[in-house]
């Protein structure tokens, strides 16, 4: 019910498709328009793909900047073909504000815990492979390698092990890096009475790292068990006679990550409403 109110007025276009199966194929056309579809990009054979990708990323921010808008860019995906976007692609436009929000709100302990967990898993993997095949699945333990369940929340927030369609332990640190950028949107948003036009281009990878979350509020938890809730609310996957298949843990994880993202965006929209700057006709939500 809350989402219906928060997203009231939006139009969902379901008859659309990405121009490519991967981000480096889908993003250019999404950001730059028809001139950056795969066939058009391929016509420029003497130019590097990275240069054409950067052009597409800059298309809207630069146009708005040149027309008097105050422009901000968050995490321009694959900028300069770097996994961590290279913000220098906007160096010719000093008035464009650019930031990396992915992982900006994480504890300093997360990287250390990630390294520690991987080192332990490498050792566990070696032991598993040295054992007879008949016992390897027991030692593997769905990727836990029989890890003790007695851990602090922060220690447990490195990776998630999905043990069934409705249960999981741990939490994926990559998911948290994107998710916490969404939860902080009201905090990092500033409203003014200047009346200046603004443009924000934001990439967020929360839905790119599917995890199981604790229903019904889809909150982050080191131990997730939605068995009872999913059983009692199985009808929520059918709307207007159309159903989505929800049988495997991965399917529920994708659903949960999308729900969590929409809920945080809804809270941000409420923040904008409260401050008198909300206009959904100027908000576009897309995926590549």
What are these regions (language model features)?
Residues 2-238:
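Active-site-proximal alpha/beta segments of enzymes that process anionic O-linked groups
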């Amino acid at each position: 019910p809350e989402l219906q109110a928060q997203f009231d007025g939006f139009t969902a276009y379901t008859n659309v498709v990405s121009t490519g199966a991967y981000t480096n194929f889908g993003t250019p056309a999404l950001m730059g328009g028809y001139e950056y579809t795969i066939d058009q990009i391929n016509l420029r054979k003497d130019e590097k793909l990275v240069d054409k990708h950067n052009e597409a990323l800059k298309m809207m921010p630069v146009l708005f900047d040149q027309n008097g808008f105050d422009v901000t860019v968050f995490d321009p995906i694959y900028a300069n073909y770097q996994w961590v976007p290279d913000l220098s692609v906007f160096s010719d436009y000093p008035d464009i504000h650019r930031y990396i929000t992915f992982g900006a709100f994480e504890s300093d302990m997360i990287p250390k815990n990630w390294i520690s967990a991987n080192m332990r898993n490498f050792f566990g993997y070696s032991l598993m492979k040295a054992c007879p095949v008949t016992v390897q699945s027991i030692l593997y333990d769905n990727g836990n390698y029989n890890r003790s369940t007695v851990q602090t929340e922060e220690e447990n927030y490195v990776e998630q092990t999905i043990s069934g369609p409705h249960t999981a332990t741990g939490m994926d640190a990559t998911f948290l890096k994107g998710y916490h950028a969404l939860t902080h949107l009201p905090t990092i948003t500033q409203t003014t009475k200047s009346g200046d036009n603004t443009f924000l281009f934001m990439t967020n990878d929360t839905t790119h790292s599917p995890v199981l979350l604790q229903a019904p509020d889809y909150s982050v938890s080191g131990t997730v068990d939605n068995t009872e809730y999913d059983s009692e609310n199985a009808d929520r996957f059918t709307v207007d006679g159309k159903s989505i298949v929800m049988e495997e843990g991965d399917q529920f994880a994708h659903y949960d990550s999308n729900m969590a993202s929409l809920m945080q965006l809804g809270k941000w929209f409420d923040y904008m409403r409260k401050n008198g700057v909300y206009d959904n006709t100027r908000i576009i939500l897309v995926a590549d």
